[in-house]
Swiss-Prot record:
One of its GO terms (molecular function) is rRNA binding. GO terms for biological process: translation. The lineage of its organism: Eukaryota, Viridiplantae, Streptophyta, Embryophyta, Tracheophyta. Its main location: plastid. This is Small ribosomal subunit protein uS11c. Part of the 30S ribosomal subunit. One of its GO terms (cellular component) is ribonucleoprotein complex. Coiled coil: none annotated. It comes from Psilotum nudum. It is found in: Plastid, Chloroplast. Keywords: Chloroplast, Plastid, Ribonucleoprotein, Ribosomal protein, RNA-binding, rRNA-binding. InterPro entries: Ribosomal_uS11, Ribosomal_uS11_bac-type, Ribosomal_uS11_CS, Ribosomal_uS11_sf. SUPFAM superfamilies: Translational machinery components. Belongs to the universal ribosomal protein uS11 family. It comes from the Eukaryota.
Amino acid sequence: MPKPIKRLSSHKKKRVIFKGIIQIKASFNNTIVTVTNSQGQVITWSSAGACGFKGTKRSTPFAAQIATENAIRTLISQGMKQAEVMISGPGPGRDTALRTIRKSGLVLHFVRDVTPLPHNGCRPPKRRRV
């Protein structure tokens, strides 16, 4: 039986990106960080669940920090220098994720809050009784 051939490098294309958009979705249960180029094509993404946090630990600010560091590490290796940040959601990880991006050394053009707010749209779910 022949031995399997070891792959020397990954099949993933090496891209050089100078400017991109970092989108942070901070929900009450998880924090998802997606990085796109200016056309909207996804370059990399990371989330608290994908970084190994399970259950209620996903909703912590520390999990959001690790997920953001994971995404930014990939960006810097691909040569990104400038970024725009769009934050949506009311979760506990939104401030920590933004702090982590500021410490990373990327030049931020703007930080925008794009949390969707209803103008009295759908009826909300009933209140929880615990």
